[in-house]
Amino acid sequence: MKDLVKFLKAQSKTSEDFDVIKIGLASPDMIRSWSYGEVKKPETINYRTFKPERDGLFCARIFGPVKDYECLCGKYKRLKHRGVICEKCGVEVTQAKVRRERMGHIELASPVAHIWFLKSLPSRIGLLLDMPLRDIERVLYFESYIVIEPGMTDLERGQLLTEEQFLDAEDRWQDEFDAKMGAEAIQALLRDMDLEVECETLREELQSTNSETKRKKITKRLKLLESFIQSGNKPEWMVMTVLPVLPPDLRPLVPLDGGRFATSDLNDLYRRVINRNNRLKRLLDLIAPDIIVRNEKRMLQESVDALLDNGRRGRAITGSNRRPLKSLADMIKGKQGRFRQNLLGKRVDYSGRSVITVGPYLHLHQCGLPKKMALELFRPFIYAKLESRGFATTIKAAKKMVEREDAIVWDILADVIREHPILLNRAPTLHRLGIQAFEPILIEGKAIQLHPLVCAAFNADFDGDQMAVHVPLTLEAQLEARALMMSTNNILSPANGEPIIVPSQDVVLGLYYMTRDKVNGKGEGMLLQDSREAEKAYRTGQAELHSRVKVRITEYVKNAIGEFEPQTHLVDTTIGRAILWMIAPKGMPFSLFNQTLGKKAISKLINESYRRLGLKESVLFADHIMYTGFAYAARSGSSVGIDDMVIPQKKYEIISAAEEEVAEIQEQFQSGLVTAGERYNKVIDIWAAANERVAKAMMENLSQEEVINREGQPEKQASFNSIFMMADSGARGSAAQIRQLAGMRGLMARPDGSIIETPITANFREGLNVLQYFISTHGARKGLADTALKTANSGYLTRRLVDVAQDLVIIEDDCGTHEGIVMTPLIEGGDVKEALRDRVLGRVAAEDILKPGTNEVLISRNTLLDEKLCDVIDENSVDSIKVRSVVTCDTDFGVCAKCYGRDLARGHLINQGEAVGVIAAQSIGEPGTQLTMRTFHIGGAASAAAKESSVQVKNTGTLRLTNVKFVTNKEGKLVLTSRNTELTIIDTFGRTKEHYKVPYGAVLNHADGEEVTAGETVANWDPHTMPVISEVSGFVKFVEIVDGLTVTRQTDELTGLSSIVVQDVGERATAGKDLRPALKLVDAQGNDIFIPGTDVMAQYFLPGKAIVTLDDGAEVFVGEPLARIPQESVGTKDITGGLPRVADLFEARKPKEPAILAEISGIVSFGKETKGKRRLLITPMEGETYEEMIPKWRQLNVFEGELVQRGDLISDGAETPHDILRLRGVHAVTDYIVNEVQEVYRLQGVKINDKHIEVIVRQMLRKAIITNAYDSEFLEGEQVEVARVKIVNRKRAEEGKPLVEFERELLGITKASLATESFISAASFQETTRVLTEAAVAGKRDELRGLKENVIVGRLIPAGTGFAYHQNRQKNRLVGGMENTTEVKLSAVDEEEIASEFTFSAEDATANLAEMLNMADDAE
């Protein structure tokens, strides 16, 4: 028996015996060494006997026997002849599965170039030979000769010759030179290359050249040559002389019924190669004419190309049914390829799926499993139990019992299932909460029952969703399922640390109804001794649920030693709240319950319970909340009737007022006072505002009702209208939806996103007329179409994010860095978008936090900021904190726990081995998919907020202006002439309360440093146009303003007023292209006026579309507008813009018209202009002037003589993250990406913690470009992992050498994934062919560091519970080298080894073996 086990062990080589996977080029000898024989014939199997043909593609002599331990002719059968080679048919007697691993080979009659190294760009062969691909192809496909050895002639090595030139040369020099065609020629050239010498010459060239393109080209070649030298690959191996043949069971021939066969495409492709190869051999033996041989060689080359990568060159070879054959390359790439279909995603045994239904009576850790499913899933366990308890003598008998479904089987099943967790999964699994463990409860019926509270995590509903069940088999798997994946351990969301086990819909409505109060309810003013009595009063009908009463409440408060002490008070509350208090756990304050509970408040309840009382109490509490909510929702009897949609009386007045305003604007437009664009914008604004007013009137109407109180006086109270209650509680629906039911539907968007200017004034209760209905359908259908498209987009974004971040794992506790990022509260306008406490909660302080204005340390560095410490920060009004961040973490190939901070899903400092990269990717990707599915909920109703046109402050304080330049107009008001002015309001403690951006041309009512009071308007401007402000007083003089060339004149028919509109450069006649229309200010004598304090003329260049209403020579005063430029109209805000925006940010794409930033600090001036561009010069205090050409149509934010700082805006536009990184550094680019991504999600009301985005940014900043390599192993301009450079620099610092200088580089997530050090991970992501080609040429090693690589080779991942396993492996490797560890393993193969995996006695084993053999005989 022991021998058998040892034999089986030896058979299966474990995945333990390698640590690195190396990929390289195979030499012909290597291919021959893999092979078990040469395949000489294209035949597959004999059509009569169905036995494989000898020497054919399925030959048993080469590849092994077709049946286990049986040779082909049948002379040797059974196990006893193991290892014998039959002398008759030459087949070795062994297991048939060797046909899956034994390879053959084909000796090619003429060499063939490998298409991957030829055609995969950049062509490696072309790069090595320094020849264009086109030329190499001409040689390979026998169109031209190439000179291999010029000898004493005036030809050059590598020169191409046509047929005529070759014949001429032969006449002239006879045998002096050598020129060939075909792969032999290329192989000879590659073989003759001296890599070392070539490298030397290239290095010298690199030193001597100045041209940038040349440098790049040389560096590319140099890298390729060096990689060949280092990897030990020989260039000539890129041309094959021997072709390996895949084992036959990996390209099977399957008999179908009716005597036909289904075959793998590879067999066809191999057959082609063998046929052509044999024909070529014959032709060579016959010494056939050159032209025939050549043609045959070309065909051989083409057939090998098709086998390796069909369709890469020329037309794809197709099979009988006109579809291209699937080549070897197609087998591994794409979604259906080997990597993604079979290695990263496998089908799993012991699993089933079924429809889900509600299980409202379940506990949180339970799910209902249909008996039928359980019986099937736990089959082997049942067999074992039946046998061990003596109900069945053999497995066969047990099987029969289970099939008969004997009564005893059900008892055993219940026993087996007890405390055996199962996993439930709902596709799509967008985050880790999409798979959770539950304890199964056996139920009748065929649907899985799911606990309602976990639906949010699974994003499940019961409209026909299905879920899959998986059974964890081993003890370890069960342990992990119970300890880590149980639904009760996943109360908080990993994305934002808030509870995800939150009641919704019915439960919320029930609790809301139960905790509402009512004026003059039955039994108001009763005095009750406790919650019990309150319930009694309600049940007996003495009091209503909502009546206001006084109740004695006993709270439990923790004392100094952490024990609960009871405290009793008399509290004003309602009957319902008192009843709800009965389920509150000890230690919760009653104040949290003594309010009307909406969805937010309930979420807060659960959160508080978790933070105060821990996991167990919170789970029980959540369950009780759910049961109570369901019960009282049923009691409330809420339902919706058409009468609940109350239309406000004011609606009709508001609409007619709006219609009058629109008519007025229309009149202004017709009299030429406003342009078409301005009119459109203003109309949209009027309707948007009217819609808001109607909605407000409607909500006021719905949300309140007037009742008579006990004193007989009228009093307002919140309404008990069902629709209002549903929306107000957060159970279903929103104000926006009610607005469409009972207000007005409002503005609609066209499918392209532009807004239709006639709104739908009706609502759904009144009903829509045909036109309105038609307009409505636009939005609704667009929503549905978008959803389908965007789901795919979002899934792809998630995939890219996971791929870029998958190898980021917490690998140490503290990296010891003092770096970090500075956090301040996010203030936009008068609102604090995110308070400082919310941003730093769960982070680790990077520096001591001081009390403002003193040196007293509030919190010392390296402290995890939890809720209590955040309260301290709030109380002391700290306004900026430097916290540790993943982006600044110093750990190589991972992150440290301190830089990451709190594990959001658990609430304590994160553990080592946590896969933070994947969690971050899921947290960002998951809402993307959710949001994509939510566009059509508001039915395309345009929510264009009326554009802001003033700043009205909300707090009293001091006004502060930054980046400000202004002129004072004749009324004494300040007019801004600076572009990015920021206006902040500071309170008496020096805290920023409000923050606004104020545009150019705004009129300010207060100067810097003045006191302002709340509600005051401090600035106004026209939101639809941008003025050009005069900075001096004088007379206007037109410059290059020529009618019909640079401008068009528009005269209004009604008023006779004329205005001048500047044409865009692109629309002008050729003569006007170089003209630059401008307004110049001159004094009364016609002399130029200079802007005060500078030597710059007061001349204003007018961009396209600018409108001038002044006449030539008109007088203007300082601060007055000279011209106005209409601004673009608004589109609808919708995540459609959101999802692509997030993708653009993570891909670090350059925007269409990027902002231009100042490269250095200095004084701006303009140099000589070229045709379409102007020359911007920046002169620093010292050093050389920087110059940049800027297209003339770009609007500049700077004037001549202005001082700019490095990184300042010169021309408006979207900023490019690459520029921000280059000019402002890592912190600025992190801030930019984090804030921009958060902006998109915030718009949708999705909370994601900043650190997830930072994790992705860290991965985008993984690479550096070497700027000065000194004498290190790097090349200048090479792209290297930052961690590698840091390691080298540490070593150099110890040796006292100068440190390698580098610049961080920002890569988009796709690029970053493909640039990862692991080629296995990159190949399984995208562009498999390119990645593998590159890796093979460079002889890359994969250290199996990330998660994907380990999944692919079938190991535990180096994260979570697999983290320790990998650490041990590394220790073993360091201690004894790999050899020892394998020996240790083998010496341990004894009793104890077996015992650890499964226990059985020898008798049992033999009995079972005998039974199996019998069964096999029966089968025969």
Curated annotation (Swiss-Prot):
- Task of the protein: DNA-dependent RNA polymerase catalyzes the transcription of DNA into RNA using the four ribonucleoside triphosphates as substrates.
Query: Transmembrane region positions?
Result: none
Taxonomic lineage of the native organism: Bacteria, Pseudomonadati, Pseudomonadota, Gammaproteobacteria, Pasteurellales
What is this protein called in UniProt? DNA-directed RNA polymerase subunit beta'
Positions annotated to bind Zn(2+) 2? C815, C889, C896, C899
**What cofactor does this protein call for?**
Mg(2+); Zn(2+)
Any one Pfam family match given in the protein's UniProt record, by short name: RNA_pol_Rpb1_5
Name the encoding gene, please.
rpoC
Q: Indicate whether NADP appears among the record's keywords.
A: no
SMART domains associated with the record: RPOLA_N
GO annotation, biological process: DNA-templated transcription
Q: Which reactions are catalysed by this chain?
A: RNA(n) + a ribonucleoside 5'-triphosphate = RNA(n+1) + diphosphate
